[in-house]
């Protein structure tokens, strides 16, 4: 079957790889000159099934007010006269209940864990390299009250069988020795030993080459204008290279997915939430993190990627703006220098922002639409890297007529037919 994939981020490329492996004739279209140059370019670097949770949860509205007032707060809202933004925020607030949180998290954990297993299979099968490490992740609590308040999180981890360790100061230092010099700045941590780290951009570029070896064709520097339909089917995609036609179509355009399907009558509440990162050359290896340390107070992840440190964080709701703000850079700088003062050379850091494709309830949107030959693979939010391989494989199984190895029936766009979407 001839399949056209729109988007060459990590979701589009994993979808292409698995579809080609299943014997399909695959073409990937993207406006960029290479794969993974937008949201997949410089994310925090975590492959963290254990942290696969909805942003919408009980207590979040109250916390949001506090975050908005903090100097280095993790949340920024830049109000716009955009009804889509406000409708999306309202839908998110409707999901901030214990009952909805439990349902939404139960939909996220299986695909995240399956995806990590698929990633491990890829490493074994094709030897792909991407500055990967399998040393777990550490959620660091600066205050004892934060550590004491982990009961609900631990209960959820137990419920889903996710291995964890609650660590005091010395336990944190044992897994992250560079923290020894700042031990007065934290009370303890929660470690997830099965989580991994790696460079998403490096991975996606490498997997694209493997996909090409399987026959995948990439059409870069190609703008995507609109989708054309004929009754209950998609008949083509209008691009800067002309109208492209296939037997099946996969939409993996991240935050831009909603705009493309809205004219088709598909209500897809995926909205961009901007994240920022800095990438810092390691100055002193003994002063750098071994894996990922999540600074819970500022919601900042500090990750070692080869000879670099990636520092990522902030949730900025400001539409499709990619503008870089110095205040957001200051938050990332502060978290790094406060916890790993000897680790990186900030004078040589690069500053970046990307638009995370967020759903109001948390889980991604994977599966068929009202058009028989149009499938969605989008809305992964902060977990695109974590969920990428599993999402791509599930999508390939669907189009190949196979039953996916993990149940994703609750991840289709149809779930937004009820009021919580």
Curated annotation (Swiss-Prot):
GO terms for molecular function: D-amino-acid dehydrogenase activity; potassium ion transmembrane transporter activity. FAD binds at residues 3-17. Its cofactor is FAD. It catalyses: a D-alpha-amino acid + A + H2O = a 2-oxocarboxylate + AH2 + NH4(+). Disulfide bonds: none annotated. GO terms for biological process: D-alanine catabolic process. Its EC number is 1.4.99.-. The keyword Signal does not apply. InterPro entries: DadA (IPR023080), FAD-dep_OxRdtase (IPR006076), FAD/NAD-bd_sf (IPR036188), K_uptake_TrkA (IPR006036). Keywords: FAD, Flavoprotein, Oxidoreductase. One of its GO terms (cellular component) is cytoplasm. Oxidative deamination of D-amino acids. Belongs to the DadA oxidoreductase family. PANTHER family: D-AMINO ACID DEHYDROGENASE, SARCOSINE DEHYDROGENASE-RELATED. This is D-amino acid dehydrogenase. It comes from Bradyrhizobium diazoefficiens (strain JCM 10833 / BCRC 13528 / IAM 13628 / NBRC 14792 / USDA 110). The lineage of its organism: Bacteria, Pseudomonadati, Pseudomonadota, Alphaproteobacteria, Hyphomicrobiales. The gene is dadA.
